[in-house]
Design a protein with these regions (language model features):
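Iron-sulfur cluster-binding electron-transfer modules in prokaryotic oxidoreductases
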Residues: 1-191
Length: 191
């Protein structure tokens, strides 16, 4: 495939990533598999890049695992997500930044559902208000932590204490991050 064709195809998958003021939400399971990953991410953004990253201690899991195993109904997961969005806006943030790929998929699926079926969004508003007295707004920006790191990759590399290079050739190492197939499985243009 010619380079122009690759660039054109790749451009279909580009999305807007916020520059700052991230409302970060930890994964309920990722840290079990990759201890320190969330803390390291926050350290890179705050200490190395000087970004405003807020982590709310009242945030709850998205219940994605329960949803995908058909234990948690879709109406419930929408209300949980709406509550998390409410917490984000309450703290003055609008850029939602999940660490978990399952959560990212859930948030994306729900935003798409609300876009195509506004009655679902209204039903969720009603449930959330009745259950918690809260209201919510959708995030201005939804980006997985890998998206944010990719956006700032050159700035991170320039400030890196240790360079990832081949010691024999001095050339940069080629690396890849497997973030999980469900990151963009249902909505490839959102991943």
């Amino acid at each position: 495939m010619k380079q122009e064709g690759k660039k054109r195809i790749w451009s279909d998958y580009q999305k807007e990533i916020a520059d700052d003021k991230f409302y970060f939400v930890r994964s309920c399971i990722r840290q079990t598999f990759f201890p320190g990953s969330d803390s390291t991410y926050i350290k890179i953004l705050r200490d190395v890049l000087g970004k405003d990253v807020y982590e709310n201690p009242n945030h709850t899991t998205c219940t994605g695992i329960g949803y995908h195993t058909e234990v948690v109904p879709f109406e419930t997961i929408q209300a949980v997500v709406a509550r998390n969005y409410s917490l984000m806006r309450e703290k003055g943030y609008e850029n939602y930044n999940p660490s978990c790929v399952t959560s990212f998929g859930i948030y994306t699926e729900i935003l798409e559902t609300w876009h195509h079926f506004p009655e679902e969004k209204q039903k969720t508003r009603d449930f959330l208000k009745k259950a918690t007295g809260r209201e919510f707004e959708e995030p201005k920006n939804l980006a997985h932590t890998s998206d944010v790191l990719f956006k700032f990759r050159e700035e991170i590399a320039a400030k890196a204490k240790y360079k990832l290079i081949n010691k024999e050739t001095g050339k940069p190492l080629k690396v890849v991050d497997h973030i999980g197939c469900h990151y963009s499985k249902m909505f490839p243009n959102k991943g």
